[in-house]
Design a protein with these regions (language model features):
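Hydrophobic alpha-helical segments at protein termini of multi-pass membrane proteins
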Residues: 1-227
């Protein structure tokens, strides 16, 4: 939906004459919904998705019978990523990535992906035992979500940098299209991961009680963990 609106407003901007009020209006609307920009509606939405992921992981840490520390760690990852979406912290990794890229002889536009990959590998290694211990449906949803997210955040992001470099740092429709794909993959991957975590919960209403929340731990039948 957000990507469709951004594309619609971009087309309107292209079809109008620069300097006209309607062109300026389309530009402002495009930037407001541009999934590649920061501190706008899509970035807020992505930040809220990470917050939802963190909240579900923290809830699991409270209700789970085992691996509570790992669930809490997953929640902290979600909090950090939510802050990053709002504050663009990952782009500051260029200070580390640029000298590394020069030393390795790699021609990258977004050099932050080098330390970003290292961080992603470390986080994945720490959380993999937890993910592998989940029930099959949740396990595959989280694994698929992580793979789709990294495909967008690392691979397609690097591709968008190559597009920028090819067009001498000019924002063209090629770059906008690649960025749309990147952000869509990131949001889709995150949504899959959230669905995987939430699939571990069972919320039911009993006649004698309002609501009962059960956390489907990886071993044994679901236990009543909270109400």
């Amino acid at each position: 939906m957000l990507a469709s609106l951004a594309g619609l407003f971009f087309v309107g901007m292209v079809l109008t004459t620069p300097g006209e009020k309607v062109h300026s209006l389309f530009f402002q609307l495009w930037y407001l919904f541009d999934v590649g920009a920061e501190r706008n509606i899509p970035s807020w939405y992505a930040s809220m998705l990470w917050a939802a992921f963190a909240g579900s992981a923290f809830a699991a840490a409270v209700l789970a019978c085992r691996k509570r520390v790992s669930w809490a760690a997953m929640g902290l990852v979600g909090v950090a990523a939510s802050i990053d979406e709002h504050s663009e912290l990952h782009e500051r990794l260029d200070q580390i990535g640029t000298p590394l890229a020069e030393a390795l002889g790699w021609d990258l536009w977004f050099t932050w992906v080098i330390p970003g990959v290292v961080i992603a590998v470390v986080v994945a290694a720490l959380l993999l035992p937890l993910v592998l211990s989940l029930r099959p449906r949740s396990r595959w949803l989280v694994l698929a979500g992580g793979a789709v997210f990294l495909l967008g955040a690392i691979v397609v992001e690097s591709l968008s940098g190559l597009v920028l470099a090819h067009f001498a740092d000019q924002v063209t429709w090629h770059f906008i299209l690649v960025t749309l794909v990147e952000e869509l993959l990131e949001m889709l991957g995150l949504a899959l991961a959230i669905a995987g975590v939430l699939a571990m919960f069972d919320v039911s209403r009993l006649p004698e009680r309002a609501w009962t929340v059960r956390f489907r731990d990886s071993t044994g039948p679901a236990e009543v963990a909270g109400e």
